[in-house]
Amino acid sequence: MSAAVILIIEDDVHIAGLVTHVLREAGHAPAHVRDVNAARAWAEAGNTPAAVLSDLMVAGSGGPDRLPDTVAAIFPGAPLALMTGVPRNRRATLGVSHEPILEKPFELEALADLVTALLATRPGTTR
């Protein structure tokens, strides 16, 4: 079985590095881009992720409330989880209701568990 490609959309290189390390240690094949425009270019180059982890406040999404739809348009069928330091009450005022959301700072085990759960939601995946 090949490693699942997990796309990380994150503008903070330190967080991206940590997430990349955790996913690689868990046996996945992480790929990192800094914003939605780079994710679009990555897709246009013929890449397809098994799942996407994205920071909520990344450039090129049209706003945090539009990020889930923007990512879904680029990667149809790929499950998405958001990562953010924005508190829950602030997310509500931004119009963000997408789940799952991993709140920063997060435990590394929570990240690994989230990715496992995301991969289990892919079409054609048996549980």
Report residues per predicted region.
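Conserved phosphotransfer microenvironments
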Residues: 55-72
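Acidic, metal-coordinating helix/loop segments flanking the phosphotransfer/catalytic sites
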Residues: 32-51, 91
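Hydrophobic/aromatic residues positioned on beta-strands within the core alpha/beta folds
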Residues: 83-84
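Conserved phosphotransfer cores of two-component systems
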Residues: 44-47, 71-77, 90, 94
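C-terminal output helix
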Residues: 106-118, 123
